[in-house]
Amino acid sequence: MGRFIFVRVGLLVVFLSLSGTGADFDCPPDWSAYDQHCYKAFDEPKRSGDAEKFCTQQANGGHLVSIESVEEAEFVAQLISENIKTSADYVWIGLWNQRKAPYCVSKWTDGSSVIYKNVIERFIKNCFGLEKETNYRTWFNLSCGDDYPFVCKSPA
């Protein structure tokens, strides 16, 4: 009887420790779960548009990563640090400038609006990446034609 209670309590502790970590999300193999989304960092450098197209082909609803909070930014930075091994100075995210006269409007490639911002430079180019020098925590305005690793995000 004592062993049975110990096992039940042990299983309950494991279940509670996993709740909220994304362990219950249905992500593809080798993808990481966070807040009802799946993420994967890809080490193969691509141009921003090619990386976006690649992400849409990897998972239903997939796009280059959109970052909507400080907590998500920390998660993505950790994911990149653990999975990107190239010496690239930047990693693509899904933020693009959409030039509509007389303004420049930034949007995520998944269509969502920008509600959290962490930009280090003026918006003079059309694409954005996370900068290695800031441990992938700051957004940097980049030329879309450059080749960098990237992170994809899809609904879980």
Curated annotation (Swiss-Prot):
Residues 1-23 form the signal peptide. Glycans are attached at residue 141. The keyword Disulfide bond applies. Disulfide bonds join 27-38, 55-152, 127-144. It is found in: Secreted. Gene3D superfamilies: Mannose-Binding Protein A, subunit A. This is Snaclec A14. GO terms for cellular component: extracellular region. Shows greater sequence similarity to the alpha than beta subunits compared to other heterodimer snaclecs. Interferes with one step of hemostasis (modulation of platelet aggregation, or coagulation cascade, for example). Heterodimer; disulfide-linked. It comes from the Eukaryota. Expressed by the venom gland. Residues 34-153 form the C-type lectin domain. GO terms for molecular function: toxin activity. InterPro entries: C-type_lectin-like, C-type_lectin-like/link_sf, C-type_lectin/snaclec_domain, C-type_lectin_CS, CTDL_fold. The keyword Disulfide bond applies. Pfam families: Lectin_C. Belongs to the snaclec family. Its main location: secreted. Keywords: Disulfide bond, Glycoprotein, Hemostasis impairing toxin, Secreted, Signal, Toxin.
